[in-house]
C-alpha cells in the first residue's frame, strides 16, 4: 500500500499482550485528496429601528388602501410631534389632518418631552371631529409601522370614542 492511501490508527485492546498496536486502513482513491469546501460566510444585515418600521409600513400599505368611501387614517410619530392624516389614495388627497403643531393643541397642553398618551387622545378627538364635520364616518386605520400600543392605541381609541368607525 502507498503511504498516501493508508491511514494509521492507534488501537489498544485489553486482551492483547502488548499495550498498543497499529492497524492500517486503506481508503478509496476519491477520498485521498479530499478537502472540505469552505462555505460562504453569511452575515446578518444590521437594520435600524427606523428601517424595520418602514419595512412594516410598506407591508401594511400593500393591504390598506384609502377610498373615497373609506379613507385611510395614517399616523406618524416623531420624537417631538404626532401627526394624523385622513387620505383618499385614489385621488391622492388629504381630506383631514391634525397634529401637535396646531395651535389648538399646542396652546392647551404643555409638554416638553414630546407627545404623551394624553396628547394622543386629544389628537384622536380632533381628527374624529374634523372627519365627522366633513361627512367621513368610516376609515381604514394605518398605524404607520408602529406597534399598536401607547400613543398609537390611545389615538385610535379616542377617535373611535368620538364617532369614527375603523
UniProtKB/Swiss-Prot annotation:
Localisation: Plastid, Chloroplast
Annotated keywords: Chloroplast, Plastid, Ribonucleoprotein, Ribosomal protein, RNA-binding, rRNA-binding, Transit peptide
Transit peptide location on this chain: 1-44
Listed GO CC annotations: chloroplast; ribonucleoprotein complex; ribosome
Domain of life: Eukaryota
Pfam families noted in UniProt: Ribosomal_L18p (PF00861)
InterPro entries cross-referenced by the UniProt entry: Ribosomal_uL18_bac-type, Ribosomal_uL18_bac/euk
GO biological process: translation
CDD domains, per database record: Ribosomal_L18_L5e
Molecular functions per Gene Ontology: 5S rRNA binding; structural constituent of ribosome
UniProt keyword Lyase present: no
Keyword Ribosomal protein: yes
Gene3D superfamilies, A to Z: 3.30.420.100
NCBIfam families: L18_bact
Assembly mode: Component of the chloroplast large ribosomal subunit (LSU). Mature 70S chloroplast ribosomes of higher plants consist of a small (30S) and a large (50S) subunit. The 30S small subunit contains 1 molecule of ribosomal RNA (16S rRNA) and 24 different proteins. The 50S large subunit contains 3 rRNA molecules (23S, 5S and 4.5S rRNA) and 33 different proteins.
Note: There are two forms of L18, alpha and beta, both with a MW of 11.5 kDa. They probably differ by an unknown post-translational modification; their first 26 amino acids are identical.
UniProt record similarity statement: Belongs to the universal ribosomal protein uL18 family.
Function: Component of the chloroplast ribosome (chloro-ribosome), a dedicated translation machinery responsible for the synthesis of chloroplast genome-encoded proteins, including proteins of the transcription and translation machinery and components of the photosynthetic apparatus.
UniProt name for this protein: Large ribosomal subunit protein uL18c
Amino acid at each position: 500500500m502507498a503511504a498516501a492511501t493508508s491511514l494509521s490508527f492507534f488501537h489498544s485492546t485489553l486482551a492483547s499482550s502488548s499495550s498498543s498496536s497499529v492497524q492500517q486502513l486503506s481508503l478509496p482513491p476519491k477520498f485521498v485528496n479530499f478537502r472540505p469546501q469552505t462555505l460562504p460566510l453569511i452575515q446578518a444585515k444590521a437594520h435600524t429601528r427606523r428601517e424595520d418600521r418602514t419595512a412594516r409600513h410598506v407591508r401594511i400599505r400593500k393591504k390598506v388602501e384609502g377610498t373615497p368611501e373609506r379613507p385611510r387614517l395614517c399616523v406618524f410619530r416623531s420624537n417631538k410631534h404626532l401627526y394624523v392624516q385622513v387620505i383618499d389614495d385614489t385621488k391622492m388627497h388629504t381630506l383631514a389632518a391634525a397634529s401637535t403643531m396646531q395651535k389648538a393643541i399646542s396652546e392647551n397642553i404643555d409638554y416638553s418631552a414630546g407627545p404623551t398618551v394624553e396628547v394622543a387622545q386629544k389628537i384622536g378627538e380632533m381628527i374624529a371631529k374634523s372627519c365627522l364635520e366633513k361627512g367621513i364616518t368610516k376609515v381604514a386605520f394605518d398605524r404607520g409601522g408602529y406597534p399598536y400600543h401607547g400613543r398609537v392605541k390611545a389615538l385610535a381609541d379616542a377617535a373611535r370614542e368620538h364617532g369614527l368607525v375603523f
